Curated annotation (Swiss-Prot):
UniProt GO MF annotations: polyphosphate kinase activity
pH dependence (record): Has two pH optima at 8 and 10.
Regulation of protein activity: Shows little dependence on metals.
GO biological process: phosphorus metabolic process
Pfam families: PPK2
Sorted UniProt keywords: Kinase, Transferase
KW Cell wall biogenesis/degradation (keyword) present: no
Protein name: NDP-polyphosphate phosphotransferase 1
Keyword Membrane: no
Domain of life: Bacteria
């Protein structure tokens, strides 16, 4: 997919599709299906997208640094907690995937909790999150977090205004407690424009491989865009504390979004290179008395390819 079309909006769509090639599959997509929608949404506002070669070169460099960070976290028994928040379709999942892609899942893990159960709803609000906080030598990334109360729960009416106010009073001290306990806490908000969210939702509607990402809550969030904006602004004003400030990542270009977030994350943690002992691969030992057993054919996966 390297040709140039006469329609700039389709060039942008092609770049979006190529972005998925690094995920080990290609998406068959009907470009005419969305071309009119893209023209209508963007007109002359097509975003300036980062070149793919520049993107991958820098992504690999940053992922190598993330491995160094992982080694440092494990070696120093540090605790890192990264909160990822933002509008629906803002690219949080893509950023998280690029952060964890080459890391050890036993050290760097992702937490994405479902809606609270009836029992959890009766608990102290932060209680369901506490078991997932990092222990020594761990990095934890929250794909949405306790800030659901300030966002979706508030806008959709799942929490009362009294509960929201209690949250705003509690969360600064809760996060100060985490920092005092030795946790390195980073909070990111991923920001996209109204038009960009509309386009990404349309791609989810028309792309069978992305339809699972589209929920009734996503559709409702389009209707309540301004309510979410107001809730976000109050969340920033009430929870942006010196011990745990917010960092906003612009996300209209997903490639820049990923690189900028990872670059910033690395700059906020004082990690160092950890020396490793040289590894020498031992020779295989052969036992002259060993005979390999012949296994029945039904144990093998058929060679279709």
């Amino acid at each position: 997919m390297t040709h140039e079309s006469d329609d700039p909006s389709l060039d942008w769509l092609e770049a979006e599709l190529e972005d998925s090639l690094d995920e080990d599959f290609e998406i068959e997509f009907s470009e005419p299906m969305l071309s009119m929608e893209i023209r209508r949404i963007y007109k002359d506002q097509r975003p300036d997208l980062l070149d793919r070669q520049v993107y991958f070169r820098n992504l690999l460099r940053l992922q190598a640094e993330l491995i160094k960070l992982q080694d440092w976290v494990q070696h120093t028994n540090s605790k890192v907690l990264i909160i990822m928040e933002g509008r629906d379709a803002a690219g949080k999942g893509g950023v998280i995937k690029r952060i964890t892609q080459r890391l050890n899942p036993r050290i760097a893990r992702v937490v994405a909790l479902p809606a609270p159960s009836r029992r959890e709803q009766s608990q102290w609000y932060f209680q369901r999150y506490v078991p997932y906080l990092p222990s020594g030598g761990e990095m934890v990334l929250f794909d949405r977090s306790w800030y659901n109360r300030a966002g979706v729960e508030r806008v959709m009416g799942f929490a009362t205004e009294d509960q929201v106010e209690q949250f705003f009073q509690d969360v600064p001290e809760f996060e100060r407690m985490l920092v005092r306990s030795g946790i390195i806490l980073l909070k990111y908000w991923f920001s996209i424009t109204d038009e960009e969210q509309q386009l990404r939702f349309l791609m989810r509607v028309h792309d069978p491989m992305k339809q699972w990402k589209l929920s009734p809550m996503d559709l409702e969030s389009r209707i309540r865009w301004e309510q979410y904006t107001k809730a976000k602004e109050q969340m920033f004003s009430r929870t942006n504390i010196p011990e745990a400030p917010w960092y906003i990542v612009e996300g209209n270009d997903k490639k820049r979004e990923r690189l900028n977030c990872i670059e910033h994350l690395l700059s906020k943690i004082p990690y160092e290179d950890i020396p490793h002992e040289k590894v020498t691969l031992p020779d295989r030992r052969y036992n002259p008395d060993y005979e390999r057993q012949v296994l029945p054919d039904e144990l093998y996966v058929p060679k279709v390819y």
